[in-house]
Amino acid sequence: MAQHTVYFPDAFLTQMREAMPSTLSFDDFLAACQRPLRRSIRVNTLKTSVADFLQLTAPYGWTLTPIPWCEEGFWIERDSEDALPLGSTAEHLSGLFYIQEASSMLPVAALFADGNAPQRVMDVAAAPGSKTTQIAARMNNKGAILANEFSASRVKVLHANISRCGISNVALTHFDGRVFGAAVPEMFDAILLDAPCSGEGVVRKDPDALKNWSPESNQEIAATQRELIDSAFHALRLGGTLVYSTCTLNREENEAVCLWLKETYHDAVEFLPLGDLFPGANKALTEDGFLHVFPQIYDCEGFFVARLRKTQAIPVLPAPKYKVGNFPFSPVKDREAGQIRQAAASVGLNWDENLRLWQRDKELWLFPVGIEALIGKVRFSRLGIKLAETHNKGYRWQHEAVIALASPDNVNAFELTPQEAEEWYRGRDVYPQAAPVADDVLVTFQHQPIGLAKRIGSRLKNSYPRELVRDGKLFTGNA
């Protein structure tokens, strides 16, 4: 790989020399930072198995190297530099994989280590969604996830990724993460706080990441991180697991934040060592059992991960003063819910007891049951999946529900050719050589549901959402 020139402030280099353990070479650190980052992907096991994915992509000649801490994660090498962007491949468009940096797969691995099986999880700083979607896959779309994002502009991206991956057990919120300790005390079995940080570990992806770096900025960020971890710890139930992570390298934003929590709450905080998380984890292990990943250790981004358990109750914070407002949804009555379920099944949409029907005016929604305890405590940006809109002639089934709930083996499923699938993703109607029989057609490609179409004569009317329509070169190679 070609080198690229990374900007390093002198004070940063001094700080890294002091922070780096004697077992590591500082020259190796500098050399690793100058190398471009290896690309990596994670197979979405909600949609396919790793074995089936490897078989499906074998003809492409990709070199996929397993990532030690994530069974479904791979570093990827491709022959041609001007190859089709990974985001334009059919497998990415249908949600079979997520483009995710290898080290960012570590926090979720830590969250579910040692057989941990949480039922209600919070991702405090969730956008763009790599870790939320990874958590959902580990939970197999069961239970419930509260995915919060403080930046309003990033909530839309977060939802798009959740929808593409076929995830149904997520509620989205748009809050400052510091409110949750007071708003939802002891409500979560597990919490991931991938904290906003100075980003010192991302220089391999962004050589100018340290242009605005300063020790003073680190201190300001660490102060915010302490407030965030304090809030998260209050929101964690007794016996629950909290994972704290950053993509930065200084001790102040990493070890010091965790040690501050321990000093504040003493025996209520138990550090859970991560030395056995994966083979070779001991290379990054600190004396407190955290993983401080310098980029030269595993040839990835710099990263920090700590796992802790709440072993004692702590004083409750004062209740928040904000008003949530009236919840605009109401549960669908059992009889009507049965009729809706039957109609949905006729077009290939099915769901289990983890989801419950709610309605708002003419909209029908499916909410994860595990999130209902939070209604009235927080204001949601989006909850579960929108199933349908009702109209005089029945139901207008929603694209996100098709991606999350449809079975490609349903009687109305119709497999498109690559050229037809590409037309579908471009938002155009499809004219198959042999028209399907059903009026409501479950459109599939590579045996994956990619939408629902109305058959009008020999034409399949495109219902692909306008905001998702793709231009340019796609997987058949035609622009």
Swiss-Prot record:
Matches recorded under Pfam families: Methyltr_RsmB-F, Methyltr_RsmF_N, Methyltranf_PUA, YebU_pre-PUA_dom
Keywords attached to this entry: Cytoplasm, Methyltransferase, RNA-binding, rRNA processing, S-adenosyl-L-methionine, Transferase
Single GO BP term: rRNA base methylation
InterPro entries noted in UniProt: Methyltr_RsmF_N, MeTrfase_RsmB-F_NOP2_cat, MeTrfase_RsmB-F_NOP2_dom, Nol1_Nop2_Fmu_2, Nop2p, RCMT, rRNA_ssu_MeTfrase_F, RsmB/NOL1/NOP2-like_CS
Gene Ontology CC entries for this record: cytoplasm
Binding site for S-adenosyl-L-methionine: 125-131, 149, 176, 194
Active site: 247
Gene Ontology molecular function: RNA binding; rRNA (cytosine-C5-)-methyltransferase activity
Domain of life of the organism encoding this protein: Bacteria
Keyword Amino-acid biosynthesis among UniProt keywords: no
EC number: 2.1.1.178
Catalytic activity: cytidine(1407) in 16S rRNA + S-adenosyl-L-methionine = 5-methylcytidine(1407) in 16S rRNA + S-adenosyl-L-homocysteine + H(+)
Family: Belongs to the class I-like SAM-binding methyltransferase superfamily. RsmB/NOP family.
Entries under HAMAP family matching the protein: 16SrRNA_methyltr_F
Name the record gives this protein: Ribosomal RNA small subunit methyltransferase F
Organism: Escherichia coli O1:K1 / APEC
Protein's gene: rsmF
